[in-house]
């Protein structure tokens, strides 16, 4: 589906059984921690979870995103996933082997519905579109670089854990509502889809960046832009 169509959609169809929901800002606010945690489980790349994988003895450079998702799946399927999948229920799905190629898949034996690596990729891609997430395929050049990356991320997570967690979405809403380029109030923002809101954030940032550059040009402080 072309990205422009998402502005007015409530969901993104994946196949005949699965659709990825596009909730409102208000719905996300009421379930912020669990919602973004599930989005992370569905879109995470091994590099995003390098510390967690290292803690259980897995080298993040040796697995792919599908294998990572399978590690999360039992935890994910026990949660309320309605903001992501609507009435599609993950609980009946169990790991199985595809007899055609020997790959691990997830199967609902009662309905025959399957989730494989390709389908998971489509689901993750839809969520990345909704939230403007980049797919991080980076890998360290060698073992020493890998250890350095893990240790640096471990320190970052430790510092983050020492701070009181605030609602990042709420802070972003307050910032935008008090920006002249944004034309919604608090209640109006709650009714926007999370995709509409994320698009608004991106456009406001672009507009402010453009205005600042133009101001610099005319003030004579950004001569590189006119050379």
Where are these regions (language model features)?
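Extended, charge-biased low-complexity segments
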Residues: 59-81
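An amphipathic, hydrophobic-aromatic interaction surface with interspersed Lys/Arg
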Residues: 1-63, 122, 128-216
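Hydrophobic, aromatic-lined core segments that form the binding pocket/scaffold
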Residues: 74-162, 166
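Conserved small/polar residues in nucleotide/adenosyl-binding loops
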Residues: 226
């Amino acid at each position: 589906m072309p990205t422009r169509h998402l502005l007015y959609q409530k969901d993104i169809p994946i196949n005949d059984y699965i659709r990825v929901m596009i909730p409102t800002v208000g719905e996300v606010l009421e379930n912020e921690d669990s919602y973004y945690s599930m989005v992370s489980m569905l879109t995470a790349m091994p590099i995003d979870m390098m510390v967690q994988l290292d803690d259980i003895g897995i080298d993040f450079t040796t697995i792919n995103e599908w294998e990572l998702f399978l590690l999360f799946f039992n935890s994910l399927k026990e949660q309320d996933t309605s903001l992501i999948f609507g009435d599609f229920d993950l609980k009946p799905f169990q790991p199985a082997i595809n007899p055609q190629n020997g790959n691990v898949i997830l199967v609902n034996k009662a309905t025959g519905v399957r989730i494989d690596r390709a389908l998971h990729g489509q689901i993750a891609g839809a969520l990345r579109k909704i939230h403007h997430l980049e797919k991080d395929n980076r890998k360290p050049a060698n073992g020493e670089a890998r250890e350095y990356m893990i240790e640096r991320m471990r320190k970052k997570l430790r510092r983050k854990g020492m701070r009181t967690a605030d609602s990042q979405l709420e802070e972003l809403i307050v910032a935008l509502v008090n920006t002249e380029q944004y034309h919604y109030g608090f209640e109006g923002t709650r009714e926007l889809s999370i995709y509409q809101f994320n698009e608004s954030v991106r456009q406001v940032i672009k507009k402010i960046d453009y205005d600042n550059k133009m101001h610099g040009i005319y003030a004579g402080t950004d001569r590189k832009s006119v050379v």
